[in-house]
Structure formats: structure tokens, C-alpha cells
């Protein structure tokens, strides 16, 4: 009999694994996680997060494909390999106790928007009714600038850039140039709402840009 003990609630991990599997499958079916890309996580407790392992088809995840990391991004419990971008998840859990879920996707809309708006460093969104989808917003009469960070394989550098901007600006997500979108929320439902709102608003901006030449 396996008597291994873990420094987290394994029953809670099982619940979160199924939550992640079900939601990530839907995002994969939408075409937002091509070629094993993207990564997804959920806060497990005040020291750990459940996160998808690296290199797996996100439309075919099983419970063993969800691992645990601490907030320094290190594997806990099982010796599995987390995503190279794990630090971009755990920095949010460490900084904001209210954040419960982080989603990272690679839809064509998100990736194209990241390329087109990289020179400006942000995507400006203003006057849209769907801006009310972002937690804390109650009107369309507002504007937000969604940052576009330069892509890098050095997650320490990128996480520092994100932290520096979070010191100055309230964010619900950000883009990485030529890469994709990070969005988060208090739980899976809120994180998905933010993710889907960004997708819709970026699509609108790209269409306006195309129509106006």
C-alpha cells in the first residue's frame, strides 16, 4: 500500500485536476492550445498550485497530467516537469492571495494581436460594453491598456517585467509578443470570463483595423 504523504490536500488536488481537465479540454476544442502549447493552473492552498505538466496535448489531459508546484515554481510531491513558464503563474499567486486561477492560451487572434501591437507595447481597449466583463468594472465608459511584453525564454526576466508593471497598473491579463495571452481571476469561472472577454475584444480591434485599412 502506498503510504506516501504529501504537503497538500490530495483530495483537493483531485478536484482541481478534474476542473482543469474539463475547462482546458473546451479551450483546446476552440483551437486555443495548438501543438501541446499553453499552460493552466489553479491555486491549491496558500503555498501550492496545481498546474498542467509540460509537453502534453491539452485536449487529452488526464489526472496524472496535473502536478503540484510551490510558489517558487518547483515541483512538489511527484518528480514531474512543469511548464517553463510556471513562474508566470506562481508570481501571481504569491503576490495576490485573491487570485485563484491563471490561464495561458495561444489562439490565432491573441497571437496576431500580440504581433501587431508589440511596437506600441499595448492594446488600447475603450468604449466596449464587454469591458464590464473584467472584475471591478461597471461601465463601458472606460479604457484599459493590455500590455504586450517582448518574448523571452528567460522567465526570471519576464516575471520581473510583469511585477514592475503590476506595481503601477491594475491588470486582468497581458500578451507576450508572438506568443499568447495570460489571464487570471479569483476562480476558474472568473479567469475564463476574462480570457474570453480579451479574445472577443482583440478580435474586434483586429477587425476594425482590417476594415479601416
From Swiss-Prot:
One Pfam family linked to the record: Aldolase_II
The keyword Amino-acid biosynthesis is assigned to this record: yes
Keywords: Amino-acid biosynthesis, Lyase, Metal-binding, Methionine biosynthesis, Zinc
Pathway assigned in UniProt: Amino-acid biosynthesis; L-methionine biosynthesis via salvage pathway; L-methionine from S-methyl-5-thio-alpha-D-ribose 1-phosphate: step 2/6
GO molecular function: aldehyde-lyase activity; methylthioribulose 1-phosphate dehydratase activity; zinc ion binding
GO CC entries: cytosol
Reactions that this protein is recorded to catalyse: 5-(methylsulfanyl)-D-ribulose 1-phosphate = 5-methylsulfanyl-2,3-dioxopentyl phosphate + H2O
Chain ranges passing through the membrane: none
Uppermost EC category: lyase
Cofactor note: Binds 1 zinc ion per subunit.
Role description: Catalyzes the dehydration of methylthioribulose-1-phosphate (MTRu-1-P) into 2,3-diketo-5-methylthiopentyl-1-phosphate (DK-MTP-1-P).
Name the record gives this protein: Methylthioribulose-1-phosphate dehydratase
Organism: Stenotrophomonas maltophilia (strain K279a)
Top-level taxonomy: Bacteria, Pseudomonadati, Pseudomonadota, Gammaproteobacteria, Lysobacterales
Amino acid at each position: 500500500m502506498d503510504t506516501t504523504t504529501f504537503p497538500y490536500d490530495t483530495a483537493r488536488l483531485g478536484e482541481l485536476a478534474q476542473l482543469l481537465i474539463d475547462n482546458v479540454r473546451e479551450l483546446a476544442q476552440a483551437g486555443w492550445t495548438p501543438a501541446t502549447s499553453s499552460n493552466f493552473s489553479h491555486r491549491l492552498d496558500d503555498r501550492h498550485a496545481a498546474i498542467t505538466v509540460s509537453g502534453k496535448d491539452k485536449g487529452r489531459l488526464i489526472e496524472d497530467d496535473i502536478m503540484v508546484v510551490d510558489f517558487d515554481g518547483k515541483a512538489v510531491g511527484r518528480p514531474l516537469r512543469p511548464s517553463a513558464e510556471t513562474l508566470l503563474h506562481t508570481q501571481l499567486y504569491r503576490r495576490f492571495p485573491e487570485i485563484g486561477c491563471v490561464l495561458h492560451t495561444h489562439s490565432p487572434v491573441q497571437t496576431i494581436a500580440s504581433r501587431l501591437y508589440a511596437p506600441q507595447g499595448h492594446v488600447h481597449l475603450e468604449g466596449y460594453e464587454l469591458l464590464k466583463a473584467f472584475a471591478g468594472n461597471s461601465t463601458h465608459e472606460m479604457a484599459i491598456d493590455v500590455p504586450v511584453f517582448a518574448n523571452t525564454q528567460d522567465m526570471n526576466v519576464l516575471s520581473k517585467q510583469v511585477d514592475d508593471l503590476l506595481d503601477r497598473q491594475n491588470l486582468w491579463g497581458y500578451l507576450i509578443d508572438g506568443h499568447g495571452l495570460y489571464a487570471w481571476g479569483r476562480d476558474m469561472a472568473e479567469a475564463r470570463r476574462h480570457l474570453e472577454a480579451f479574445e472577443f475584444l482583440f478580435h474586434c480591434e483586429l477587425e476594425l483595423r482590417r476594415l479601416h485599412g
